[in-house]
């Protein structure tokens, strides 16, 4: 599995600010979107382009235009919505597929409760967005749903990832690509990432 830890100074700086315990909801939300945008820049670096001719200010001009598979952004509810706008800043024409998944706090297993995928998802590249890759359960279950629907080109974008989640994802879906702003130390006894970001969903939606 391709694993990319984005080490750009801007990414590291913004993620560091997100780790502050007393960060405001507004600031956390802004930074989640900004880091999501920077991760998208990395994840789409291999998109193919083609030459097309358009009418410029002084006559015809040849430009590069993205070709090939179109994109669907797949936020995992609810926290994934915090990264979605940042992704769409780079790929504004992308369609949105939504997957609702929550983690059973006792078993740590993912529980699906909603899904709405674009109709032609088999023709698109999916960018799954979720702030945390902890045990990997929610992301793995989401990929299962996408593959069942016919999607074969899948990339995962997360703010922070635990080694345990990376290992589980690689075992379940070695053909996907993972882009993260940080590979953190690991999980605590409650299944939360250390040092992590705390509860990203609560911080994005102001419910902490």
From Swiss-Prot:
Its EC number is 2.4.2.9. Keywords: Allosteric enzyme, Glycosyltransferase, GTP-binding, Magnesium, Nucleotide-binding, Transferase. Uracil binds at residues 193, 198-200. Coiled coil: none annotated. The keyword Nucleotide-binding applies. Allosterically activated by GTP. Pathway: Pyrimidine metabolism; UMP biosynthesis via salvage pathway; UMP from uracil: step 1/1. 5-phospho-alpha-D-ribose 1-diphosphate binds at residues 78, 103, 130-138, 199. InterPro entries: PRibTrfase_dom, PRTase-like, Upp_B, UPRTase/APRTase, Ura_phspho_trans. Its cofactor is Mg(2+). GO terms for biological process: UMP salvage; uracil salvage. GO terms for cellular component: cytoplasm; cytosol. One of its GO terms (molecular function) is GTP binding. It catalyses: UMP + diphosphate = 5-phospho-alpha-D-ribose 1-diphosphate + uracil. Catalyzes the conversion of uracil and 5-phospho-alpha-D-ribose 1-diphosphate (PRPP) to UMP and diphosphate. Belongs to the UPRTase family. This is Uracil phosphoribosyltransferase.
């Amino acid at each position: 599995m391709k694993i990319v830890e984005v080490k750009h100074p801007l990414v590291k700086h913004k993620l560091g600010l997100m780790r502050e315990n007393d960060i405001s909801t507004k600031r956390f939300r802004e930074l989640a979107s900004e880091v999501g945008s920077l991760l998208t820049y990395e994840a789409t670096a291999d998109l193919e382009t083609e030459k097309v001719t358009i009418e410029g200010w002084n006559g015809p001009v040849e430009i590069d235009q993205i070709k090939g598979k179109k994109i669907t952004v797949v936020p995992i509810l609810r926290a994934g919505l915090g990264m979605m706008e940042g992704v769409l800043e780079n790929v504004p024409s992308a369609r949105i597929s939504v997957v609702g998944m929550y983690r059973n706090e006792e078993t740590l297993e993912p529980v699906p409760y909603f899904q709405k995928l674009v109709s032609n998802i088999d023709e698109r590249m999916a960018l799954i967005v979720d702030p945390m890759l902890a045990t990997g359960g929610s992301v793995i279950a989401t990929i299962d749903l996408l593959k069942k629907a016919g999607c074969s080109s899948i990339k995962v974008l997360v703010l922070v990832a635990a080694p345990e989640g990376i290992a589980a994802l690689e075992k379940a879906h070695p053909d996907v690509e993972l882009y993260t702003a940080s590979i953190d130390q690991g999980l605590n006894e409650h299944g939360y990432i250390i040092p992590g970001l705390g509860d990203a969903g609560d911080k994005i939606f102001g419910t902490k």
